[in-house]
Amino acid sequence: MAGKARVHELAKELGVTSKEVLARLGEQGEFVKSASSTVEAPVARRLRESFGGNKPDAVKPAAGASNGAPAKPSAPGARPGPRPGPPAPAQPKEPPAPAAPAAAAPAPAAPAPPAAPPAPAASAAPPSAPEAPSARPTPGPRPGPGGPKPGAPKPAPRTPRVGNNPFSSQQPVERPAPRPQGPAGPGGPRPGPGAGGPRPGGGPRPGATPGNMPPRPVGGPRPGGGPRPGGGPRPGAGPRPTPGGAGRPGGGGGGNYRGGGAGGGGGAGGAAAGGFRGRPGGGGGRPGQRGGAAGAFGRPGGAPKRGRKSKRAKRAEYENMQAPVVGGVRLPHGNGETIRLARGASLSDFADKINANPASLVQALFNLGEMVTATQSVNDETLELLGGEMNYVVQVVSPEDEDRELLQSFDLSYGEDEGGEDDLEFRPPVVTVMGHVDHGKTRLLDTIRDATVREGEAGGITQHIGAYQVTVDLDGNERPITFIDTPGHEAFTAMRARGAKATDIAILVVAADDGVMPQTVEAVNHAQAADVPIVVAVNKIDKEGADPAKIRGQLTEYGLVPEEYGGDTMFVDISAKAGTNIEALLEAVVLTADASLDLRANPDMEAQGVAIEAHLDRGRGPVATVLIQRGTLRVGDSVVAGDAYGRVRRMVDEHGEDVEEALPSRPVQVIGFTSVPGAGDNFLVVDEDRIARQIADRRSARKRNALAARTRKRISLEDLDSALKETSQLNLILKGDNSGTVEALEEALLGIQVDDEVQLRVIDRGVGGVTETNVNLASASDAIIIGFNVRAEGKATELANREGVEIRYYSIIYQAIDEIESALKGMLKPIYEEKELGRAEIRAIFRSSKVGNIAGCLVQSGIMRRNAKARLLRDNVVVAQNLTVSSLKREKDDATEVREGYECGLTLTYNDIKEGDVIETYELVEKART
């Protein structure tokens, strides 16, 4: 059948139901939707082949029977020559087969009358039909032009016997090429049996064309191989040709020759069987051998594939069987291996690690109630949960480990001295002054270095870290000591923690008249967490009410036991203002350093340290205060600190003087960064600017991802409804004089406790004055600009006034926190509480066509007020609420309100009222938020 055929047409042709055809197509790997769908010609051919052996036609069963025998002989394809003789023994089941060889001779002589024999052959077919069933019907259906394609007789084939070959419709005519080959090679020897001559009769085989399909029934001739001498048997074996011709084009032809001869001479059924045996070379249509009709589009013939799956499909199916189902989506299944992910990683990063599709992970989380995108940063808990569902152990790499791996990728290391013991030299101790606000930390440092830094601090509160190196004369020896001053206000927790990590010894300043305060305890915790020795300075001993003994007792509770109490912590009573016992304090610091610390470093390596503070200077650009911990920093070095990099163009000490190099434990201001580094960032020297830039860029990307994962509020499906409601949001842009202050301010603001109705969002932060860029961003996002110790630059103020952008300036951090907290609370939706006005009982009801039911009431308590909110009670049960007193009259006059004890008439926005009902009126009063 040329062209496409519909499933129901094929079903009708094959005598089966459409469902069976659809099922068979499914087994063959073809996707067909319904009985009205069309299938390609090659698919239809394979379908007919698969149903051929099952057809009820008598002819086909015969073919099947004959096929059964050939199957075995086909294996010894090399023996086609001798075949003529053995057919009889080989086919014990079919006695007629032996006779076939004898009759082979006459067969060749009758090539011309092939047309006539078909009829008798058909009649002969029925007898053999019963035997066919026992044989394998499946191979039978495989037609193949190969067998009958003997060499010389090729031309004859052109006159095909349409009706002879029941399977001819499945044999493409293009088999001619192989036919010639058959005779060419093995064909020569095979003709020996004498069948070679008549073999040309095989020509009819080729005649088989797609259009011959209908003639299948006529295929009966197979059994009647006798009637058709030469070609008769051949066509009968037509279905078998698969093996003979295609399986071994050359030899196959010869084999078929012999078989043909043998079959031809024999009786109808026997001949067919014999013929098959004679040309089993084709393998009796075995799939292994490419015998039988050629497939469409040049595909080899052979048994139908029956929808066999490819190895790849089987492998995929097996893997899918092992895959867990999370949220209705199939995902890879791990073996408990550990997956390392950076903090703030996205689902795409996770998918790359486990070789999965990011869309599947997104769908899985969506079905589990989490709405995230493939590129959105995901928090650690979500990644661990998703990994656990797939049998993976997700390990979120800490920032320290991630940074270490980053440096290792550039063959760099941080935190260790290079060289041996001989390369280490003494370095000065680094001392951090810590304590509660206003306890005298900066005054103590001023007294030590004879400076007046305290007067420059707003409100007398230290706003950022200062690092200084002073030289102390102890017992005739000059000992340099580096001091780091930290702020004591509660908002500067992170800055105190950095100071503790960068120090060797901590001086804890406690006011003798104030005692241990919250920030005092916090400073103790920071120092103990960093394993830093503590020297306690009890300050303000000259003030009234000072009680140093009380301080010692309080600090004992926190593990700081004085030496006089049998502990190992040195306590020194001082007065920073009067300069009392300052020398004793410094001596205690040096003794502690010498006794418990190994203060050595290698000055010959490339410099490493920590950025204590950083700010943006109008004339000098980004300026970072760095503390060198090991190595020597020189002008011209390529440096990287956090996500900032650059080349050292200038270094300045605490006195404002330029220095060419800085040794370990020396604090200096470095100028030359391309951006402002963060306070507390690691600082190190690299070989090239290129390496510094690459490290900084990768740190910056990692920082953005981590920040996004921390600040982005995830919305679950359960919260979606409430999230879509209108919420108030206060956007802020923070600008400060240094990075540490900006960081502390941001942490304090984000920590303000307000209702979920209001959100605080810091959309930008930076160091330096307020610029026009900041104003434009604030205008576009309805943000407020907070300037801390900075002012607007150039035309920024004019632009802000024109755009209506609010800029607020602060110099004291807690003032900024208080005002912003008040602003947030002002954005909250007001809270209303109900205040009862009065109660009235309905004594009579008057009906009006204009206004509805009118209630005649007696005011029992309070007042009835027009347009007031009301509710209707019946037997002390609320019948209706959120009502309004539409009109109110006292006798015949309109009234605004009616007091207790008076009668009135009123109408409500509700008509189902009865006598005896009670009307309560009330008003909503806004309640101040606390």
Swiss-Prot record:
Residues 575-577 are annotated as: G5. Residues 305-314 have a biased composition (Basic residues). Residues 193-205, 244-301 have a biased composition (Gly residues). The keyword Cytoplasm applies. GTP binds at residues 435-442, 485-489, 539-542. The keyword Cytoplasm applies. Residues 539-542 are annotated as: G4. Residues 485-488 are annotated as: G3. InterPro entries: EF-G-like_DII, IF2_II, IF2_N, P-loop_NTPase, Small_GTP-bd, T_Tr_GTP-bd_dom, TF_IF2_bacterial-like, TIF_IF2. One of its GO terms (molecular function) is GTPase activity. GO terms for cellular component: cytosol. Keywords: Cytoplasm, GTP-binding, Initiation factor, Nucleotide-binding, Protein biosynthesis. Residues 31-317 are annotated as: Disordered. Residues 426-598 form the tr-type G domain. Residues 460-464 are annotated as: G2. PROSITE patterns: G_TR_2 (PS51722), IF2 (PS01176). It is found in: Cytoplasm. Residues 435-442 are annotated as: G1. Residues 61-78, 121-135 have a biased composition (Low complexity). Belongs to the TRAFAC class translation factor GTPase superfamily. Classic translation factor GTPase family. IF-2 subfamily. One of the essential components for the initiation of protein synthesis. Protects formylmethionyl-tRNA from spontaneous hydrolysis and promotes its binding to the 30S ribosomal subunits. Also involved in the hydrolysis of GTP during the formation of the 70S ribosomal complex. This is Translation initiation factor IF-2.
